[in-house]
A protein has these predicted regions:
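Short, acidic, metal-binding catalytic loop of nucleotide-sugar glycosyltransferases
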Residues: 7-19
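The conserved acidic donor/metal-binding loop of glycosyltransferases
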Residues: 74-78
Length: 637
């Protein structure tokens, strides 16, 4: 993970590369990181006896560097090569002005300079190259965007209007002058990024969120890690608002204070969600009235708010988030967040910074523990519907329709939450990324060539000569035995899928695989895993799935850039044609298919174990008869 990020940093474009310095800020003082820094030719800044988690590590790095601008990246955030050239120019705006007549940029004159115009932070959107848990667990890969896109691509950019953009801790550029003025990264919070942006704005600096994705990271891969991450965000935002008093500060505009008030109230909205779920249950099951009103009074107060909320979501979310998905996400997270938010607001603080795990520590993404509250609420909702409709007919059912609709509306969201927490198996170790790159497969002549390619220091010697030159399509009669052109369709850290123009004999197993053209072009060793023909619609193309190995460090570095310096291809908008019915049918069908697959695997393993036991019994019988013969022979002697 760290290799990918550091490698991408060394490939970033900049007019004068000598002014770009890349460092590992390591508060673990690990030998592996020291070795990796030396391997990639970048700096290493250790932080011994760090008592302040990420803030202490970053402040230590600030003390050991001098550049006027600092870009920060989390270990899993891989920057695009265009990151610096797209972000650094914003810091030049105080010295430049655009001519209204010609549109050309020029230096500001002394009279035009404004000392109050100071850029402190440029934040790019957070994006991810793997599916987030809502996409993955709900089998909605191409139906919904990443859950965090709504904040990064919509909310944070709208906060620009009040200069209340939030620093999200990674893929951002910060002014050193601004950091020195506010005393560095704040220590007494578990979300130092959010509080840093608050303090920069209160110091008179402009913070701005851009709309172009400049880095891709790794989403959390299991429900418990994601919930812990959200608890840290909730507690940290409340801590930072209390630490800075930003809601009541006159150092920022009134609109910015309202924005931060909304940030605080957002985390309390999960209480609203729980009340919204429990209210009809309490009335239908226990005759407890949360609100004592008539139907018309309810419609007068509820209907306008529902209408304006729906309209604002449609106008402001650009099809990234809908009211339905906001309800599903809030319902999923609410039971886990209400207690931490309540405690933090009362001043019972969480002071320990907990790093969010991004590596796959399990082959399941779900969590039964997080599912339990939703299961309980589903049982109560079903019981409430049955009790409330039992024995009612005609107009009695009509008068009860509001409560019944309310219960069913909440029940659907709860079923989504259960499906989410139920998780899904994750058989792959690395993420596949959709690509469209030229590929040339050069077949190698001997079956055992794979072992020759992967041993030693890198130069693989085949029966007919050295590893073929991937820069040319020409072949030697004594070396490669065939060249097959195609297009790489998807790639991962350990494999590539190539659509080939013509099939080749399956006896060919080892290949030199040339990938890409232009800036990134590399050749890797490939071992055929599967050769198959597509049966999807009219597509009758042949595909070759290959496992790859890198023969050198440089080869791996270029391959990583070819893989990650691109758009991810993951859905960025909601599928407008996808309905709740479609979701339910898809989730149920895929769950049944997964259960059948697991049953077949279990049955196959059981059969193999039974056959193995039979073979073992047979061998034991033969050994026993053989030993008996020896005993009888010894007795006869």
């Amino acid at each position: 993970m760290l290799f990918k990020t550091a490698n991408a940093c060394t490939y970033m474009d900049y007019p004068d590369r000598s002014r770009v310095h890349v460092y590992f800020a390591d508060d673990g003082c690990r030998k592996e990181v020291v070795s990796l820094a030396a391997e990639l030719g970048i700096g290493y800044i250790p932080c011994e006896d760090n008592k302040y988690a990420k803030s202490g590590n970053l402040n230590n790095a600030l003390r050991h560097t001098t550049s006027p601008l600092i870009a920060t990246f989390d270990a899993d955030m891989i920057p695009r090569s265009s990151f610096l050239v797209d972000t650094v120019p914003y810091f030049l705006l105080p010295r430049y002005i655009q001519d209204g007549a010609t549109g050309a940029w020029r230096y500001r004159s002394e009279d035009e300079l404004n000392e109050d115009l100071k850029v402190g932070l440029i934040q790019t959107p957070q994006s991810f190259y793997n599916l987030d848990l809502f996409q993955f667990n709900l089998y909605a890969e191409d139906k919904i965007p990443n859950e965090q896109d709504f904040f990064s691509r919509e909310v944070n950019q709208m906060r620009n209007s009040s200069n209340a953009c939030a620093y999200t801790g990674s893929n951002a550029v910060i002014s050193r002058a601004g950091m020195e003025e506010i005393g560095g990264f704040p220590y007494h919070t578990i979300t130092e990024d959010f509080e840093t942006s608050c303090r920069l704005q209160m110091a008179g600096y402009i913070t701005y969120a851009t709309d172009k994705v400049e880095a891709h990271g790794l989403s959390t891969t299991d429900v418990r890690s994601m919930v812990r991450q959200r608890i840290r965000w909730a507690r940290g935002v409340i801590q930072s608002i209390q630490n800075t008093g930003v809601i009541f500060s006159h150092k920022i505009s009134f609109s910015a204070r309202i924005t931060y008030l909304c940030s605080f109230l957002y985390w309390w909205s999960f209480f609203n969600r729980i009340i919204f779920i429990l209210a009809p249950i309490m009335f239908a099951l226990f005759d407890f009235q949360v609100v004592n009103c008539t139907l018309w009074q309810l419609l007068i107060f509820w209907l306008p708010s529902y209408f304006f909320y729906s309209r604002s979501m449609k106008l402001l979310s650009s099809n990234v988030r809908s009211q339905k998905w906001s309800q599903i996400i809030d319902t999923t997270l609410a039971p886990s967040l209400i207690i931490p938010v309540f405690l933090e607001t009362l001043g019972i603080r969480e002071t320990k910074f907990k790093v969010t795990r991004k590596d796959k520590t399990t082959n399941r993404s779900g969590s039964l523990w997080n599912m339990l509250p939703h299961l309980l609420l589903v049982v109560l909702s079903v019981a409430a519907i049955i009790r409330f409709t039992w024995g009612k007919y005609g107009m009695a059912l009509v008068y009860s329709s509001v409560i019944i609709y309310w219960l069913c509306y909440n029940l659907i969201a709860l079923l989504y939450a259960i499906a989410f927490s139920g998780g899904r198996s994750m058989p792959r170790k690395s993420t596949r990324i959709s690509v469209d790159e030229p590929a040339v497969l050069t077949a190698l002549p001997v079956e055992d060539e794979w072992s020759k390619l992967t041993e030693g220091t890198g130069e693989a010697v085949a029966e007919g000569g050295v590893f073929p030159d991937c820069s040319s399509d020409e072949t030697d009669d004594e070396g490669p035995v065939g060249v097959f052109a195609g297009r790489a369709i998807n790639m991962s850290d350990g494999g590539v899928l190539v659509r080939i123009d013509d099939p080749f004999p399956e006896e060919l197993r080892s290949f030199a695989v040339r990938l890409g053209d232009g800036r990134y072009c590399t050749c890797v060793s490939g071992r055929l895993v599967r050769l198959f023909q597509s049966k999807c619609g009219d597509d009758e193309s042949w595909y070759a799935a290959l496992r790859i190995e890198h023969r050198s460090l440089e080869e791996r570095r270029i391959y990583d850039q070819l893989l990650y310096d691109r758009e991810t291809g993951i859905a960025e908008e909601l599928d407008s044609w996808n309905t709740t019915y479609d979701d339910i049918v898809r989730i149920v069908r895929m769950r049944i298919r997964a259960l059948l697959s697991r049953y077949r695997v279990w049955r196959s393993r059981r059969r193999s174990r039974r056959d193995s036991d039979r073979c073992g019994d047979s061998r034991d019988a033969e050994r026993t008869s053989h030993d008996s013969a020896h005993v009888e022979g010894d007795a006869a002697c």
